A protein has these predicted regions:
Chain B
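Detector for methionine-enriched segments
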Residues: 1, 85-87, 152, 160
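N-proximal helix/coil linker or "cap" segments that precede and/or mark the start of modular domains
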Residues: 1-9
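Sparse, context-dependent recognition of short Cys/His-centered cofactor- or disulfide-binding micro-motifs
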Residues: 4, 20-23, 57, 70, ...
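A short beta-strand-turn-helix
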Residues: 8-25
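Homeobox/homeodomain signature
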Residues: 8-9, 80, 86, 118, ...
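Short clusters of hydrophobic/aromatic residues that line enzyme substrate/ligand-binding pockets
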Residues: 18-19, 96, 153
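C-terminal cap of thioredoxin/glutaredoxin-like
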Residues: 24-31, 37, 42-47, 103-160
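Structural alpha/beta surface segment adjacent to cysteine/selenocysteine redox centers
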Residues: 25-106
Length: 152, 160
């Protein structure tokens, strides 16, 4: 299984927002979105990754990009993680049925968590760029996302 | 403003802060003053007589006082005391609130009023941001990150 490729329409999926409302492919329409799939809330690398992206969030906004964090943690765990870090990046939960959205995007790791991966979706719902880290311990730099935004 | 796409590591320039021994090819270290791993690296570089250039990489959600500390170091630099402030900041990472910064400035004999105005100035903020953004563009993701002869050396503390 590998991450959904550029040029393909985003798959149908259902994630849960922090208030448990549904978040689907329709919520990606009309703007450029970057889904940041990360393995585990509170783990060290995921912490560094979200902290780094948060630091340059205004620069992503200038480029018209909205970031979302996606993991298989529960809504409550994601909320606690977000609060602990003091970040504003919206979190989306793939908790039940576990990993269904991650599987649809081709990023579900056999050990039960999302691969560390980035998926950029254009305003029409087409995957514009995707990236899968060589291992869950590798943290993709923010520069890679800016490169993809510049290549639009 | 443009994005922060990939760009080569900027070579050493006159604005870089060189620390330690005078060597031809110092390390380039991206770090912040609140980061415990950075403090370990700093202590080891000092102990081993290393030669390095220090560049700021503050990430506020990780280390809430890192930006303030970086700006304090740059404000001290405007009075010729970067190195002294740098050492004083790493000497006590637990005391980085404003009164602690003023106290350091006083102890170093700086003009505290000027120091306080400078550390909040757009110019100093831009100076810190320039380091940070150069790191982002060169692929720095966490602190400390060390470049040796232009190549990134990801450094877990145990490996330093």
């Amino acid at each position: 299984m590998s991450v959904v490729a550029a040029g393909t329409p985003v798959p149908d999926f259902v994630l849960r927002r922090e208030d448990y409302r549904r978040f689907t492919q329709d919520d990606l329409r009309g703007k450029t979105s970057v889904l940041v799939f990360y393995p585990h809330a509170f783990s060290p690398v995921c912490t560094d990754q979200l902290n780094l992206y948060e630091e340059v969030l205004d620069r992503f906004a200038e480029q018209g990009a909205t970031l979302y964090g996606v993991s298989c943690d529960s809504v409550w765990a994601q909320r606690a993680f977000k609060e602990k870090l003091g970040i504003t990046i919206e979190q989306l939960s793939d908790f039940e049925p576990k990993g269904a959205a991650c599987r649809a995007f081709g990023v579900y790791h056999e050990k039960g968590f999302p691969q560390r991966a980035l998926v950029m979706v254009d305003p029409d719902g087409v995957v514009q760029w995707s990236y899968e880290a060589p291992s869950p311990a590798d943290l993709p730099g923010a520069n890679l996302i800016f490169d993809a935004l510049a290549a639009r | 403003m443009g994005g922060l796409g990939s760009a080569p590591l900027p070579p050493l320039g006159p604005e870089d802060h060189l620390l330690g021994a005078d060597e031809d090819e110092p390390l380039i270290v991206y770090a912040d003053y609140e980061c415990p791993h950075c403090a370990v690296l700093h202590a080891r570089l000092v102990r081993d007589g290393g030669s390095w250039a220090f560049r700021h990489f503050p990430v506020r959600s990780k280390h809430p006082r890192a930006w303030a500390a970086a700006c304090a170091a740059e404000a001290a630099a405007l009075q010729g005391a970067f190195r002294q402030m740098h050492m004083a900041l790493y000497a006590d990472r637990a005391r980085l609130e404003d009164p602690h910064l003023w106290e350091r400035a006083r102890a170093l004999g700086l003009d505290v009023e000027r120091f306080d105005a400078d550390r909040r100035s757009d110019a100093v903020l831009a100076r810190v941001r320039r380091d940070f953004e150069s790191g982002v563009r060169a692929g720095v993701v966490t602190t400390p990150t060390v470049f040796e002869r232009g190549a990134m050396r990801p450094s877990a503390p145990d490996e330093m």
